[in-house]
Amino acid sequence: MDFFWERMLNDPQNHFSDDQKEFLNHAKYRVKRNTIFGMLVGFSLPLYLARNKKVTPIRLYATSIIGGLAGNGVAQITTLAYNLSAIRQRDDGFEILRKIQDSLIRQRTTMRQGRFPSSSSEFPPKNSKYQLPGSMPNTGASSSQDPFTNSQSTEKEDAMYSKDNGFEDRSKPASAWEAIRNRNRNTGNNSFPFYEEDSSVKSTDSAFSGQENSEAFPSRTSNLGSEQLDEPISHEQEAFDQLIWNDSSSSK
């Protein structure tokens, strides 16, 4: 927090005056002082209240820790409210709040990008020794490089950033079934799975639509006679009769 606070005060785009910087530094010191005081009071208050009572040490220490955390929170909230009221009482209070808000927005944008701005006047400076999470280390290389190399490095950084945020590249299908779905979607065919049709293979839809399809079903004018068509059925009938009646002749 001290790092971001110092960067906010020293940001050239904010243009804080010396009086405003002194006021903000005093407000920061007030927050630290009251936070420590609140933690001490919250930690020691249960010890003072339980001095004449029989309380187990573990329970007493746990209550003291909880009291210290509660005192810290109460002190921070109270001090923040006091600082805001003190800012509003100043003539330039709204200007200070606007500068703080603009600085916080720039800091958040810089952290989301994960890299430092190219200009040293922006927050944070490029030659800073502090590295934000996800930022690339500064190797001191010259900025005048091949634009093709810069574009490749930018693409690599974007790919790494997308993987870190849970986004995957959907340009390639994840499986064979997804490739089939994509191909059916592009060709407008709703059948699944998809297969290529050629002149030798007819669609089953045309066979059931009432059209003539000699390759799917035999036509009425086929050369196959009724005897040849009934031959497998007659063999099955004879086998059945022989099994039941012990006779090769069919039963009437």
Curated annotation (Swiss-Prot):
Skewed-composition ranges (Polar residues): 108-122, 136-153, 201-226
Q: Which UniProt keywords apply?
A: Cytoplasm, Mitochondrion, Nucleus
* Predominant cellular place of this UniProt entry's protein: cytoplasm
Q: Where is this region: Disordered?
A: 108-252
Entry's localization field: Cytoplasm; Mitochondrion; Nucleus
Q: Name one GO cellular component term.
A: nucleus
Q: Which domain of life is it from?
A: Eukaryota
- What name appears for this protein in its UniProt entry? Uncharacterized protein C19G7.18c
